Amino acid sequence: MIREWVAERGSERWALLLHDRSEHEWAAVDGTGHAIDIYSLGESLAELMRSCASCSFREALTDAILTIAGMRRFDRLIVECSGLVEATMAAAVFNDAIADEEPLAGLARLDQLVTVVDAATVWEGVRSADALGERGMSGGEDDTRVLSELLVEQIEHCSLIALNRSEAIDGNCRERVITLLRYLNPEAEVLLAADRVAGAARILAPRDRAEHGISFQPGWAKLIDGNDSLPESSQEWSTGVFRASRPFHPERLWRCVEEDWPGVLRCKGYFWLASQPDRCFSWEQTAGSRHFEWVGHWWVATPQPEWPTNEAFLRRLKSQWTIEFGDRRQELACIGYGADQETLFARLKRCLLTTDELLLGEEAWRRFADPFERATQEAGSREDETDPE
């Protein structure tokens, strides 16, 4: 696909930076170092090692871009990352450079972040519970991600989605896939890769406010914010946000987590537990994976002198505040296909504390048996075992 786009570049000189050249279709091209003639006009090829960790990847990518930009021979640079690399890592290279006023910010900007999606397999992929290792795609022994998790993340965090092999599926399937992409990432433009002229034109088009970095607001985040830019719900498709102020009972919620959630393709948001009332947890789910993480303390449990003081933060906090619970709340956005959202939300509602349980007070809540606490401790122990420090 990149070959086709490059063919439409006109007289511009492009550089191509590959994440891993060893298994690439251009592996047989001769050349040494960070510069190589691939096409008749003399593009550039540089290679990044696939095995590097996220920090090393960012450092290697920054160094490679600085090297190529320093040649001052090219008008544009295309970076092709491994499918195992999270798109947010590539974006962070430029966003951090802008925020920290690093040299890279003065030499290059990120115009587009493109995710290439295989139209013939993406529907099966977002519904898959297969671990990456089962597909021969694992990034290492510690890579426990599943296919649906990686695929959804890459779709959510891009500015353009190139739909490859769209001609391989019928019209109804193609429309369903495009609808899925627009639910997951309503801000991204969906391009049919078969139209290489249009694809090249869009990739060449500068992104608005590119000098300010790139940000993402996936469909789940827009749902929580009340943004109406997502496609309308239909008989098959459903979207909604489960909202509540009361805390979850840890054991009832754990049992709910362990049950099947048929039809739910994406669920993400934040929640709190009666047994850990100061902690804010994130919830992240695809059709093939479901996990939670402690991400910090609620502001009501944080000394006020430590709060940010900007007006936008204070306005938002005020809109979320209740007298009884402060900013603590349940907000879980769901996107489903063939999902019974009403039944699912009713199940979640039954996991909230009852009025009698609320009257027991926080001291009693903290003594509730809590499977989430045990799971958090076990996860922390595993991280300590793999920490090189």
Give the ranges of each region predicted by the language model.
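Nucleotide-state-sensitive switch-loop elements of NTP-binding domains
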Residues: 1-144
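Short amphipathic alpha-helices in soluble, non-transmembrane regions
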Residues: 256-259, 344-352
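C-terminal accessory "lid"/substrate-recognition subdomains
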Residues: 23, 122, 131-324, 330, ...
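Residue-level signature of catalytic and energy-coupling elements of molecular machines
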Residues: 80, 113, 158, 190, ...
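Helix N-cap motif at beta-to-alpha junctions
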Residues: 337-341
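Conserved strand-to-helix beginnings and helix N-cap segments that scaffold or border functional pockets
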Residues: 58, 88-91, 171-175, 254, ...
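Short, aromatic/basic amphipathic alpha-helical patches
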Residues: 27-39, 175-181, 346-350
